[in-house]
Protein backbone atom coordinates (compact mmCIF):
# COMPACT_ATOMS: atom_id res chain seq x y z
CA UNK A 1 0.00 0.00 0.00
CA UNK A 2 2.83 2.37 0.88
CA UNK A 3 4.56 1.50 -2.39
CA UNK A 4 1.45 2.39 -4.37
CA UNK A 5 1.08 5.65 -2.46
CA UNK A 6 4.69 6.51 -3.27
CA UNK A 7 3.95 6.00 -6.96
CA UNK A 8 0.97 8.36 -6.84
CA UNK A 9 3.00 10.95 -4.95
CA UNK A 10 5.83 10.65 -7.46
CA UNK A 11 3.36 10.97 -10.36
CA UNK A 12 1.84 14.09 -8.82
CA UNK A 13 5.27 15.64 -8.22
CA UNK A 14 6.34 15.02 -11.83
CA UNK A 15 3.07 16.54 -13.07
CA UNK A 16 3.60 19.62 -10.89
CA UNK A 17 7.15 19.94 -12.18
CA UNK A 18 5.97 19.70 -15.79
CA UNK A 19 3.23 22.30 -15.22
CA UNK A 20 5.86 24.71 -13.90
CA UNK A 21 7.97 24.07 -17.00
CA UNK A 22 4.96 24.65 -19.26
CA UNK A 23 4.21 28.08 -17.83
CA UNK A 24 7.89 29.09 -17.67
CA UNK A 25 8.53 28.74 -21.43
CA UNK A 26 6.45 30.78 -23.92
CA UNK A 27 7.26 28.18 -26.59
CA UNK A 28 4.83 25.74 -24.97
CA UNK A 29 2.05 28.34 -24.92
CA UNK A 30 2.61 29.07 -28.60
CA UNK A 31 2.78 25.44 -29.79
CA UNK A 32 -0.04 24.11 -27.60
CA UNK A 33 -2.58 26.95 -27.68
CA UNK A 34 -1.79 29.84 -30.02
CA UNK A 35 -0.64 27.82 -33.06
CA UNK A 36 -3.64 25.41 -33.03
CA UNK A 37 -6.12 28.26 -32.61
CA UNK A 38 -4.48 30.20 -35.42
CA UNK A 39 -4.62 27.17 -37.73
CA UNK A 40 -8.29 26.54 -36.89
CA UNK A 41 -9.26 30.09 -37.79
CA UNK A 42 -6.86 30.39 -40.72
CA UNK A 43 -7.97 27.29 -42.62
CA UNK A 44 -11.69 27.74 -42.01
CA UNK A 45 -11.72 31.42 -42.98
CA UNK A 46 -9.36 30.87 -45.94
CA UNK A 47 -12.02 28.66 -47.58
CA UNK A 48 -15.04 30.35 -46.06
CA UNK A 49 -17.06 30.27 -49.30
CA UNK A 50 -16.43 26.55 -49.78
CA UNK A 51 -15.56 26.89 -53.46
CA UNK A 52 -13.62 29.65 -55.23
CA UNK A 53 -15.98 32.14 -56.83
CA UNK A 54 -15.59 34.27 -59.98
CA UNK A 55 -12.28 32.82 -61.13
CA UNK A 56 -10.89 35.23 -63.76
CA UNK A 57 -11.34 33.97 -67.31
CA UNK A 58 -11.04 35.54 -70.74
CA UNK A 59 -12.95 35.30 -74.02
CA UNK A 60 -11.76 35.45 -77.62
CA UNK A 61 -14.94 36.20 -79.59
CA UNK A 62 -14.11 36.18 -83.28
CA UNK A 63 -17.77 35.83 -84.31
CA UNK A 64 -19.19 38.87 -82.46
CA UNK A 65 -22.78 37.83 -83.12
CA UNK A 66 -25.83 37.79 -80.88
CA UNK A 67 -25.31 34.04 -80.42
CA UNK A 68 -21.68 34.42 -79.34
CA UNK A 69 -22.52 37.29 -76.98
CA UNK A 70 -25.25 35.15 -75.43
CA UNK A 71 -22.70 32.35 -74.92
CA UNK A 72 -20.34 34.77 -73.15
CA UNK A 73 -23.13 36.06 -70.89
CA UNK A 74 -24.14 32.52 -69.95
CA UNK A 75 -20.52 31.59 -69.22
CA UNK A 76 -20.14 34.62 -66.98
CA UNK A 77 -23.32 33.59 -65.14
CA UNK A 78 -21.60 30.49 -63.70
CA UNK A 79 -20.70 31.11 -60.07
CA UNK A 80 -17.12 29.82 -60.39
CA UNK A 81 -16.33 31.70 -63.62
CA UNK A 82 -15.96 35.44 -64.04
CA UNK A 83 -15.29 36.81 -67.52
CA UNK A 84 -12.90 39.68 -66.84
CA UNK A 85 -11.40 40.38 -70.27
CA UNK A 86 -12.07 40.10 -74.00
CA UNK A 87 -9.12 39.52 -76.32
CA UNK A 88 -8.83 40.12 -80.04
CA UNK A 89 -6.77 37.01 -80.73
CA UNK A 90 -5.53 33.79 -79.16
CA UNK A 91 -1.97 35.09 -78.75
CA UNK A 92 -3.02 37.89 -76.38
CA UNK A 93 -5.18 35.48 -74.38
CA UNK A 94 -2.32 32.97 -74.12
CA UNK A 95 0.04 35.69 -72.86
CA UNK A 96 -2.55 36.68 -70.23
CA UNK A 97 -2.72 33.06 -69.05
CA UNK A 98 1.07 32.85 -68.84
CA UNK A 99 1.22 36.10 -66.86
CA UNK A 100 -1.36 34.78 -64.40
CA UNK A 101 -4.01 37.40 -65.19
CA UNK A 102 -6.58 34.73 -66.12
CA UNK A 103 -6.82 30.97 -65.51
CA UNK A 104 -8.21 30.15 -68.95
CA UNK A 105 -10.05 31.50 -71.97
CA UNK A 106 -12.98 30.53 -74.19
CA UNK A 107 -12.45 30.73 -77.96
CA UNK A 108 -15.42 31.35 -80.28
CA UNK A 109 -14.43 31.06 -83.98
CA UNK A 110 -15.59 33.37 -86.72
CA UNK A 111 -18.82 32.31 -88.42
CA UNK A 112 -20.05 30.25 -85.46
CA UNK A 113 -23.66 31.38 -85.72
CA UNK A 114 -23.90 30.92 -89.50
CA UNK A 115 -22.23 27.49 -89.47
CA UNK A 116 -24.43 26.30 -86.61
CA UNK A 117 -27.59 27.33 -88.45
CA UNK A 118 -26.40 25.53 -91.59
CA UNK A 119 -25.40 22.42 -89.55
CA UNK A 120 -21.72 22.52 -90.53
CA UNK A 121 -20.47 21.62 -87.03
CA UNK A 122 -18.45 24.67 -85.92
CA UNK A 123 -15.82 24.05 -83.25
CA UNK A 124 -15.65 25.88 -79.93
CA UNK A 125 -12.34 25.70 -78.05
CA UNK A 126 -11.38 26.48 -74.47
CA UNK A 127 -8.02 26.48 -72.72
CA UNK A 128 -7.40 26.23 -68.96
CA UNK A 129 -4.20 26.51 -66.94
CA UNK A 130 -3.81 23.23 -65.03
CA UNK A 131 -0.72 24.50 -63.26
CA UNK A 132 -3.34 25.66 -60.75
CA UNK A 133 -5.22 22.39 -60.27
CA UNK A 134 -8.35 23.61 -58.48
CA UNK A 135 -8.81 26.77 -60.54
CA UNK A 136 -8.10 24.92 -63.79
CA UNK A 137 -10.49 22.09 -62.91
CA UNK A 138 -13.35 24.41 -61.99
CA UNK A 139 -12.93 26.52 -65.12
CA UNK A 140 -12.64 23.39 -67.27
CA UNK A 141 -15.91 22.09 -65.82
CA UNK A 142 -17.78 25.35 -66.46
CA UNK A 143 -16.40 25.82 -69.97
CA UNK A 144 -17.11 22.21 -70.90
CA UNK A 145 -20.65 22.60 -69.61
CA UNK A 146 -21.04 25.80 -71.63
CA UNK A 147 -19.84 24.02 -74.76
CA UNK A 148 -22.32 21.18 -74.23
CA UNK A 149 -25.17 23.61 -73.58
CA UNK A 150 -24.30 25.55 -76.74
CA UNK A 151 -24.32 22.35 -78.81
CA UNK A 152 -27.61 21.29 -77.24
CA UNK A 153 -29.18 24.68 -77.89
CA UNK A 154 -28.20 24.54 -81.58
CA UNK A 155 -29.56 21.01 -81.94
CA UNK A 156 -32.79 21.98 -80.20
CA UNK A 157 -33.29 24.91 -82.60
CA UNK A 158 -32.90 22.54 -85.56
CA UNK A 159 -35.41 20.10 -84.07
CA UNK A 160 -37.90 22.90 -83.46
CA UNK A 161 -37.48 24.00 -87.08
CA UNK A 162 -38.32 20.46 -88.20
CA UNK A 163 -41.56 20.51 -86.22
CA UNK A 164 -40.57 18.62 -83.07
CA UNK A 165 -42.29 19.49 -79.81
CA UNK A 166 -40.34 20.48 -76.72
CA UNK A 167 -40.79 17.04 -75.11
CA UNK A 168 -39.66 15.30 -78.31
CA UNK A 169 -36.64 17.58 -78.64
CA UNK A 170 -35.57 17.12 -75.01
CA UNK A 171 -36.10 13.36 -75.27
CA UNK A 172 -33.79 13.28 -78.28
CA UNK A 173 -31.14 15.55 -76.74
CA UNK A 174 -31.16 13.88 -73.32
CA UNK A 175 -32.69 10.39 -73.56
CA UNK A 176 -31.40 9.48 -70.08
CA UNK A 177 -31.66 12.00 -67.22
CA UNK A 178 -28.81 11.67 -64.72
CA UNK A 179 -29.66 12.30 -61.07
CA UNK A 180 -26.46 12.74 -59.02
CA UNK A 181 -26.21 12.58 -55.22
CA UNK A 182 -22.72 13.34 -53.78
CA UNK A 183 -22.52 11.63 -50.39
CA UNK A 184 -21.18 13.12 -47.14
CA UNK A 185 -20.32 16.44 -48.83
CA UNK A 186 -23.28 17.21 -51.12
CA UNK A 187 -22.24 20.86 -51.48
CA UNK A 188 -18.83 19.81 -52.93
CA UNK A 189 -17.39 22.17 -50.34
CA UNK A 190 -13.58 22.26 -50.33
CA UNK A 191 -13.59 23.59 -46.77
CA UNK A 192 -15.42 20.48 -45.53
CA UNK A 193 -12.99 18.23 -47.38
CA UNK A 194 -9.76 20.00 -46.44
CA UNK A 195 -10.43 21.22 -42.89
CA UNK A 196 -11.55 17.78 -41.68
CA UNK A 197 -8.07 16.52 -42.57
CA UNK A 198 -5.82 19.56 -42.18
CA UNK A 199 -6.90 20.64 -38.70
CA UNK A 200 -6.44 17.28 -36.90
CA UNK A 201 -3.31 16.73 -39.01
CA UNK A 202 -1.77 20.00 -37.84
CA UNK A 203 -2.72 19.17 -34.25
CA UNK A 204 -1.06 15.76 -34.65
CA UNK A 205 2.11 17.39 -36.00
CA UNK A 206 2.23 19.84 -33.09
CA UNK A 207 1.81 16.98 -30.60
CA UNK A 208 4.73 15.18 -32.24
CA UNK A 209 6.92 18.25 -31.97
CA UNK A 210 5.97 19.21 -28.41
CA UNK A 211 6.36 15.64 -27.12
CA UNK A 212 9.78 15.27 -28.72
CA UNK A 213 10.84 18.71 -27.52
CA UNK A 214 9.68 18.24 -23.92
CA UNK A 215 11.67 15.00 -23.57
CA UNK A 216 14.61 16.08 -25.73
CA UNK A 217 15.13 19.30 -23.80
CA UNK A 218 15.54 17.25 -20.61
CA UNK A 219 18.40 15.40 -22.31
CA UNK A 220 19.90 18.59 -23.72
CA UNK A 221 19.75 20.52 -20.42
CA UNK A 222 21.00 17.48 -18.45
CA UNK A 223 17.93 17.47 -16.19
CA UNK A 224 16.82 13.96 -17.14
CA UNK A 225 18.38 12.43 -14.00
CA UNK A 226 16.50 14.87 -11.79
CA UNK A 227 13.28 14.10 -13.69
CA UNK A 228 13.80 10.33 -13.31
CA UNK A 229 14.78 10.61 -9.63
CA UNK A 230 11.60 12.60 -8.89
CA UNK A 231 9.56 9.83 -10.51
CA UNK A 232 10.94 7.26 -8.08
CA UNK A 233 13.25 5.92 -10.83
CA UNK A 234 10.29 4.66 -12.85
CA UNK A 235 10.32 5.51 -16.55
CA UNK A 236 6.57 4.87 -16.75
CA UNK A 237 5.80 7.36 -13.99
CA UNK A 238 8.25 9.83 -15.52
CA UNK A 239 6.59 9.69 -18.95
CA UNK A 240 3.04 9.65 -17.56
CA UNK A 241 3.68 12.61 -15.25
CA UNK A 242 5.37 14.62 -17.99
CA UNK A 243 2.81 13.96 -20.73
CA UNK A 244 -0.47 14.02 -18.79
CA UNK A 245 -0.53 17.86 -18.60
CA UNK A 246 0.15 17.91 -22.35
CA UNK A 247 -2.67 15.41 -22.90
CA UNK A 248 -5.14 17.61 -21.04
CA UNK A 249 -4.20 20.76 -22.98
CA UNK A 250 -4.19 19.08 -26.39
CA UNK A 251 -7.44 17.26 -25.64
CA UNK A 252 -9.09 20.59 -24.78
CA UNK A 253 -7.82 21.99 -28.07
CA UNK A 254 -9.22 18.91 -29.81
CA UNK A 255 -12.62 19.38 -28.19
CA UNK A 256 -12.55 23.00 -29.29
CA UNK A 257 -11.97 22.19 -32.96
CA UNK A 258 -14.70 19.52 -32.91
CA UNK A 259 -17.21 21.94 -31.42
CA UNK A 260 -16.04 24.66 -33.81
CA UNK A 261 -16.32 22.52 -36.95
CA UNK A 262 -19.42 20.45 -36.22
CA UNK A 263 -21.27 22.70 -33.81
CA UNK A 264 -20.54 26.25 -34.96
CA UNK A 265 -19.73 25.79 -38.67
CA UNK A 266 -22.19 22.86 -39.02
CA UNK A 267 -19.88 20.57 -40.96
CA UNK A 268 -21.52 17.18 -41.66
CA UNK A 269 -20.87 14.68 -38.86
CA UNK A 270 -22.73 11.40 -39.32
CA UNK A 271 -21.35 9.73 -36.19
CA UNK A 272 -22.28 12.47 -33.73
CA UNK A 273 -20.01 14.76 -31.75
CA UNK A 274 -19.13 12.41 -28.86
CA UNK A 275 -17.57 9.63 -30.99
CA UNK A 276 -15.53 12.35 -32.70
CA UNK A 277 -14.33 13.66 -29.33
CA UNK A 278 -13.37 10.13 -28.29
CA UNK A 279 -11.50 9.69 -31.58
CA UNK A 280 -9.71 12.97 -30.87
CA UNK A 281 -8.59 11.66 -27.47
CA UNK A 282 -7.23 8.55 -29.19
CA UNK A 283 -5.46 10.80 -31.71
CA UNK A 284 -3.79 12.79 -28.92
CA UNK A 285 -2.64 9.68 -27.05
CA UNK A 286 -1.41 7.95 -30.22
CA UNK A 287 0.50 11.04 -31.32
CA UNK A 288 2.20 11.30 -27.94
CA UNK A 289 3.19 7.64 -28.14
CA UNK A 290 4.66 8.28 -31.59
CA UNK A 291 6.57 11.23 -30.17
CA UNK A 292 8.05 9.00 -27.46
CA UNK A 293 9.16 6.50 -30.11
CA UNK A 294 10.71 9.29 -32.18
CA UNK A 295 12.81 10.77 -29.39
CA UNK A 296 13.65 7.26 -28.19
CA UNK A 297 14.90 6.29 -31.65
CA UNK A 298 16.96 9.48 -32.12
CA UNK A 299 17.67 10.70 -28.56
CA UNK A 300 18.94 14.16 -29.45
CA UNK A 301 16.74 17.23 -29.64
CA UNK A 302 17.77 18.26 -33.16
CA UNK A 303 17.41 14.83 -34.77
CA UNK A 304 14.24 14.04 -32.85
CA UNK A 305 12.51 17.21 -34.03
CA UNK A 306 13.66 16.54 -37.60
CA UNK A 307 12.25 13.01 -37.40
CA UNK A 308 8.93 14.32 -36.04
CA UNK A 309 8.51 16.99 -38.70
CA UNK A 310 9.48 14.63 -41.55
CA UNK A 311 7.14 11.89 -40.35
CA UNK A 312 4.28 14.31 -39.87
CA UNK A 313 4.59 15.80 -43.35
CA UNK A 314 4.85 12.38 -45.02
CA UNK A 315 1.76 11.23 -43.12
CA UNK A 316 -0.35 13.79 -45.00
CA UNK A 317 0.64 12.36 -48.37
CA UNK A 318 0.59 8.66 -47.58
CA UNK A 319 -2.78 8.82 -45.81
CA UNK A 320 -4.58 9.45 -49.09
CA UNK A 321 -5.28 13.10 -48.35
CA UNK A 322 -3.78 14.48 -51.54
CA UNK A 323 -3.81 11.35 -53.75
CA UNK A 324 -6.18 8.34 -53.63
CA UNK A 325 -4.76 5.30 -51.84
CA UNK A 326 -6.16 2.85 -54.41
CA UNK A 327 -4.24 4.64 -57.19
CA UNK A 328 -0.87 4.46 -55.39
CA UNK A 329 1.87 1.95 -56.05
CA UNK A 330 1.01 -1.45 -54.44
CA UNK A 331 3.97 -1.10 -52.06
CA UNK A 332 2.68 2.28 -50.84
CA UNK A 333 -0.84 0.88 -50.59
CA UNK A 334 0.48 -1.73 -48.19
CA UNK A 335 2.19 0.95 -46.12
CA UNK A 336 -1.06 2.93 -45.99
CA UNK A 337 -2.62 0.04 -44.07
CA UNK A 338 -0.19 0.77 -41.25
CA UNK A 339 -0.94 3.58 -38.77
CA UNK A 340 1.15 6.29 -40.46
CA UNK A 341 -1.93 8.50 -40.36
Give the location of each predicted region.
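Extracytoplasmic/periplasmic domains immediately adjacent to an N-terminal transmembrane anchor
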Residues: 1-192
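Alpha-helical transmembrane segments of integral membrane proteins
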Residues: 9-12, 27-31, 192-196, 200, ...
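Membrane-helix interfacial "entry" motifs
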Residues: 17, 21-24, 185-194, 230-242, ...
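Residue-level recognition of pore/gate-forming positions within transmembrane alpha-helices
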Residues: 36-37, 145, 201, 246, ...
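Hydrophobic alpha-helical transmembrane segments of multi-pass membrane transport proteins
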Residues: 38-41, 181-261
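Membrane-spanning alpha-helical segments of multipass transporters and channels
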Residues: 43, 64, 95, 248, ...
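Membrane-interfacial segments
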Residues: 46, 50-51, 159, 215-223, ...
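Short helix-terminus and kink motifs of transmembrane alpha helices
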Residues: 106, 141, 209-217, 222, ...
Amino acid sequence: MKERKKKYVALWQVMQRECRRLVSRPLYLFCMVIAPLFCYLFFTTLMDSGLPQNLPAGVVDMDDSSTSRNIVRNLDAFSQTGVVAHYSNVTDARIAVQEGKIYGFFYIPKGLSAEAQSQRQPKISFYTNYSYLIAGSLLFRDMKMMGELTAGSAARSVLYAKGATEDQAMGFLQPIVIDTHPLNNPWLNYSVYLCNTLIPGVLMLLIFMVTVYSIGVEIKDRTAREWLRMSNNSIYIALAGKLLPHTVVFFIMGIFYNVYLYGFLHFPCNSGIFPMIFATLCLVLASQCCGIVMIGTLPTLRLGLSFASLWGVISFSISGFSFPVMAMNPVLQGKCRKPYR
